[in-house]
Amino acid sequence: MAFKSIAVLSACIIVGSALPVDKYPVLKDQPAEVLFRENNPTVLECIIEGNDQGVKYSWKKDGKSYNWQEHNAALRKDEGSLVFLRPQASDEGHYQCFAETPAGVASSRVISFRKTYLIASPAKTHEKTPIEGRPFQLDCVLPNAYPKPLITWKKRLSGADPNADVTDFDRRITAGPDGNLYFTIVTKEDVSDIYKYVCTAKNAAVDEEVVLVEYEIKGVTKDNSGYKGEPVPQYVSKDMMAKAGDVTMIYCMYGSNPMGYPNYFKNGKDVNGNPEDRITRHNRTSGKRLLFKTTLPEDEGVYTCEVDNGVGKPQKHSLKLTVVSAPKYEQKPEKVIVVKQGQDVTIPCKVTGLPAPNVVWSHNAKPLSGGRATVTDSGLVIKGVKNGDKGYYGCRATNEHGDKYFETLVQVN
């Protein structure tokens, strides 16, 4: 897939100059998402950088005018920041701040305001007696949570301080992305009267890790099934989608005795890599996952892992990796541009994404339509600038994987 690019607004200014923002009233950048814990005070910032004299602030929630006085909220003194004193689930939504200044009406990006939570049933302890020499797994059901929690497996000494937990396992043992703990084979070394295998979860909703389940391996039994140690699939990644710029992992976990070390190929080419490479199977999992330290668009393709431990038939698994990208600025736009009347100006804002983003523009917080502004491959061009062209120009780019918003103040002298 080609990495498409949209030249939304040119990265060069035709006429005019960029000046320090501290001389002009511009909004401070806001995050795309703000999380809150129920009943914990939380702030949605809206602050003018530069001259904030005579600024009037207002908010919208889900596209409608928002009267903070009718809710359990307040505005910070001398700024437009919205303070939720005891936020509730009903406060969730998409918020946007507006600042009316002598230069025009500035608008923030749309901010997603979401409750963070982690709901888990009381942890239970289960006793297990697996079959010696056979592949095995310990299940950990993922909790109902937002955002997605970090799942961690540990060996915990009964009655000991959790800070003393052991997190480094034998190379036979690897946690899968589904939350489960996989044993390539079980041995008597996995049996313990004093240690438990503990699965925990943590996200922004909690200060400490939450225990989801505990296991005690009390012993092992003999294998009478005739299993000879040939590779059997435990967890293998299916067709998957990855975001450009993210860390990505392709899993190829097979139980076997002796343990087999997967080899990875992309479109038939070896991609095992070395430990220092961007793509490598050398990441403390004995090759059971292929690590992309930073995912790039050109990583898209068909990947195959092959496992052969010398016993039975070699195993092979293939999947398609599709790479997508939220909108991203190729060059950061200018916050302030000063131009003289009668001159031409191009406002910079160049965006890329997979798929190509949809772009909309605004002028003083209203949709930009018609008028004398012209969209070209090099940007938003205004020829023969007039005093009425001054104000805040917003560039918003969206696709199904995210959005970007930047606003430029055009000052006409």
From Swiss-Prot:
GO molecular function annotation: axon guidance receptor activity
Domain (Ig-like C2-type) ranges: 25-112, 122-211, 233-322, 327-413
Induction description: By bacterial infection, wounding, or bacterial cell wall components injection.
Coiled-coil features, chain-numbered ranges: none
Pfam families: I-set, Ig_3
Keyword field: Disulfide bond, Glycoprotein, Immunity, Immunoglobulin domain, Innate immunity, Repeat, Secreted, Signal
S-S pairs: C46-C97, C140-C199, C252-C305, C349-C395
Secretion signal span: 1-19
A GO BP annotation: synapse organization
Tissue: Hemolymph.
One cellular-component annotation, GO: neuronal cell body
Positions of glycan attachment: N283
Keyword Oxidoreductase belongs to the record: no
Protein localization: Secreted, Extracellular space
Domain of life, per lineage: Eukaryota
Gene3D superfamilies: Immunoglobulins (2.60.40.10)
Keyword DNA-binding among UniProt keywords: no
Role according to the record: Insect-immune protein. Forms a protein complex at the bacterial surface. Can inhibit hemocyte aggregation.
PANTHER family registered for this protein in UniProt: CONTACTIN 5, MYOSIN LIGHT CHAIN KINASE, SMOOTH MUSCLE-LIKE
Family: Belongs to the hemolin family.
Protein name: Hemolin
The organism of origin for this protein: Hyalophora cecropia
